[in-house]
C-alpha cells in the first residue's frame, strides 16, 4: 500500500513527455496563388463571371486541435492582381474562412483536410462593378513536413473554392442573377507548432 503513491507518481511522470509530443495549435504563414474569375467588368457585355484571373498574395491560418486529429481552423488570405488588358487595373481579394480540420500524422509528416465557410471581399482600383463582398466556401488539404519538433514546412495546400459573383447588366435596368464561380488556391509556407 505504501508503494501505491510512488507507482502513481512514476506513471504520471512517464506520461507527461508523451503528452508534450502532441501540439494543440498551429500557425501557418506563406505564399498564396489563386485562380478564379473575379467578376464581369462594366466594359464587358457578358452573362458570365468574366475571364479567369491569376492572383498572387499571402495566406495565414490558425488551427487549434481538440485532440490528436480533430481541430478548428481560421484561415485568412490576401491576393492581388494588376492588368491593363482587363477593364480593371488592379484587384485585391481578401478571404476569411472558418471550419473543421482533420490531420493524419504519418511519421515525420502530417496530411490534413479542412472544410471552410466564410466570405470574400474584393476591391478594384478603377472599376467598382467588380467590387463586392460575398459568401465563399472551400474544401481542401495539404501536407506538412516536420523540419524540427516545433517547425514544419508546408510544400502544398490545395483548396477548391466556390462563390457567387455579381453580373453587371450593361443592356438594361433588370438585374441579372449572380453566377457561381469555381476557383483554386495553392498555398505553401511555414507552420509553427505550440
List PLM regions with ranges.
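Subset of outer-membrane beta-barrel
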Residues: 146, 150-152, 162-167, 178-181
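Short acidic/His/Gly/Ser-rich catalytic and metal-binding motifs that mark active-site loops
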Residues: 36-39, 83, 122-124, 163-167
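Transmembrane beta-strand segments of Gram-negative outer membrane beta-barrel proteins
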Residues: 21-37
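Extracellular loop and loop/strand-boundary signature of outer-membrane beta-barrel proteins
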Residues: 43-49, 83-88, 123-130, 171-178
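Internal, hydrophobic beta-strand segments that form the core of beta-sheet-rich folds
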Residues: 157-158
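Cleavable N-terminal export/targeting peptides
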Residues: 1-23
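Gram-negative (and chloroplast) outer-membrane scaffold detector with strong preference
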Residues: 26, 61-138, 145-147, 153-154, ...
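Surface-exposed strand-loop-strand hairpins of Gram-negative outer-membrane beta-barrel proteins
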Residues: 35-59, 132
Amino acid at each position: 500500500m505504501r508503494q501505491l503513491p510512488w507507482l502513481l507518481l512514476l506513471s504520471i511522470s512517464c506520461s507527461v513527455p508523451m503528452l508534450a509530443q502532441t501540439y494543440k495549435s498551429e500557425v501557418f504563414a506563406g505564399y498564396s496563388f489563386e485562380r478564379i474569375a473575379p467578376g464581369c467588368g462594366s466594359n464587358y457585355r457578358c452573362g458570365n463571371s468574366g475571364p479567369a484571373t491569376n492572383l498572387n498574395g499571402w495566406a495565414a491560418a490558425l488551427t487549434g486541435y481538440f485532440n490528436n486529429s480533430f481541430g478548428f481552423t481560421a484561415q485568412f488570405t490576401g491576393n492581388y492582381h494588376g492588368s491593363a488588358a482587363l477593364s480593371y487595373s488592379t484587384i485585391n481579394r481578401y478571404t476569411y474562412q472558418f471550419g473543421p480540420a482533420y490531420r493524419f500524422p504519418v511519421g515525420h509528416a502530417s496530411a490534413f483536410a479542412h472544410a471552410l465557410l466564410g466570405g470574400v471581399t474584393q476591391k478594384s482600383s478603377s472599376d467598382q462593378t467588380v467590387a463586392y463582398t460575398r459568401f465563399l466556401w472551400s474544401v481542401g488539404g495539404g501536407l506538412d513536413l516536420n523540419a524540427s519538433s516545433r517547425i514544419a514546412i508546408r510544400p502544398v495546400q490545395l483548396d477548391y473554392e466556390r462563390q457567387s459573383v455579381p453580373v453587371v447588366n450593361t443592356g438594361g435596368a433588370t438585374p441579372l442573377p449572380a453566377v457561381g464561380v469555381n476557383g483554386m488556391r495553392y498555398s505553401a509556407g511555414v507552420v509553427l507548432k505550440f
